[in-house]
Amino acid sequence: MNSTNDFWLIDSNFVGVIRFYKDKDHSDKSIDYMFIEEGIIMGIHGENPPLMKTRKKVVIEEARLLWQKLLNEGWQKTNKKWWGNSTKTFFNFRN
């Protein structure tokens, strides 16, 4: 969805967001891993940074299965919803 190779989904209620992105620093170069970060939109119009709930590292095949499962459940592709690291994030609800 964008040039940084992270991919985003938003739930049908426009409350939950999930970011998928490749782990570029893992030690086992023979297996590709992805991070999956989940958060919720904060504020009535998303004016506050999202609240990060979870972050996990999975093999890329598991990430692909989860991506497809979520799309089948009604999640939608969306644009980037927060930037930076987990301690300083900014939210852009309009994208």
Identify the meaning behind each predicted range:
Residues 1-73, 77-95:
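Terminus-proximal functional modules
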